[in-house]
Amino acid sequence: MKPLDEFLPVFEFSERHRLAIAASPGRIDAAVREVSLTDIPAARVLLWVRRLGRPYGDSGKPFVAGALESSVVLDDVAGEGVVLGLTGQFWRIGGGDRGPRPQTREEFLAYDRPDACKAVIDFRAGPGLLSTETRVHVPDRAARRKFRRYWLVIRPFSGLIRILFLRAARRRAEAPA
């Protein structure tokens, strides 16, 4: 079973990317955890636009560590990968989540606001390969329509950020020690 199947087996939207990397899974996983927005200037610009000019936190902080401020770690195995869970109305500026966000795996699994999304993001290191997969579940029909419009606009840019992230991780993983 894939880690994502445990956390979000039902989803309406998804995105996957993968990249060959000449390094061990442990080195690839370590690189994923070190990549920051300073490694990906174009991503910093895209996130700035997404946030309507508001900065995206500390651009020197590793992206995965920064993501923990708005997500919950669902699975984390050193040398293999990490799965993050997010909730909210992503089509709204700031994510739109007015209620408390899940703080634990159990709270994430139990989260069931019909007007909000549940999303999982997986960064997975394997022999010579790094992959990322995002899944989003939107249970409510009206919310799904709103998210679909958002997804149509944001997905190409989200995909570009993921590809740039994978390339930055590859540069770090393949760099001489």
Residue spans of the language-model regions?
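Short, highly charged C-terminal tails/helix-capping segments
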Residues: 170-177
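Hydrophobic-ligand binding "helix-grip"
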Residues: 70-127
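Beta-strand/loop substructures that line and gate deep hydrophobic ligand-binding cavities in soluble
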Residues: 104-157, 169
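Beta-strand residues in well-ordered beta-sheet regions across diverse protein folds
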Residues: 29-31, 85, 131-133
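Hydrophobic ligand-binding cavity/cleft-lining segments
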Residues: 1-64, 68-74, 78
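Structured surface interface patches that mediate subunit assembly and partner/cofactor docking
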Residues: 3-14, 45-51, 89-94, 101-102, ...
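Intrinsic-disorder/low-complexity, polar/charged segments enriched in Ser/Thr/Lys/Arg/Asp/Glu/Gln
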Residues: 12-20, 81, 118-120, 129-131
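Terminal transmembrane helical module of multi-pass membrane proteins
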Residues: 158-162
